[in-house]
Amino acid sequence: MASIKPSPHLGQGPRVALRHLHRRDYAEIAALTRESAELHRPWLGVQEPTVEAFEPRLERFGRPAHEGFVICLRESGAIVGGVNVNDILRGSRQCGTLGFTAYAATTGRGYLTEGLGLVIRYAFGPLGLHRLEANIQPGNTRSLSLVQRLGFRCEGFSPAFQVIDGEWRDHERWALVSGNVRPTVPEGGAAGRR
């Protein structure tokens, strides 16, 4: 009897799968980032995707307070989005801060919504978190709509929250608590299922 290899995916939905970011993803992510420069510029500033910038990112995701994921198409494995859970706090807090990126070639197809649903399930399941926060600039209507669809609630406004492209930018703080999750992925696509 042949042994069944475990899936490299942390979760699968109908169209996308979730897995950890790997060093081998650099070339594909660099190309996607370059192609998406105009999409990202207003919210992330100018970011040249160099190996020198990618390596520290991988190192950061190797630490307990950070998780880095890619959302990829189930059929081809092509990367369609990136997600980070940063600043993970344990103890009495059990929370993390969510960051996410779509790529120009695949925006508007619902891949990021499906993939973030998998990340949320993974964060509130195997990661053991109770709360996720997302800090989003007020003019970033696509990201604001996305977190609203996923059930996040606006909890406040943070003036001059983060430096982007040399200037302090305001952000809205959105949060989701584990008991308030909206189903965005059919149960058959549960995170961690093999």
Region locations from a protein language model:
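Conserved GNAT-fold acetyl-CoA-binding loop/helix
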Residues: 38-58
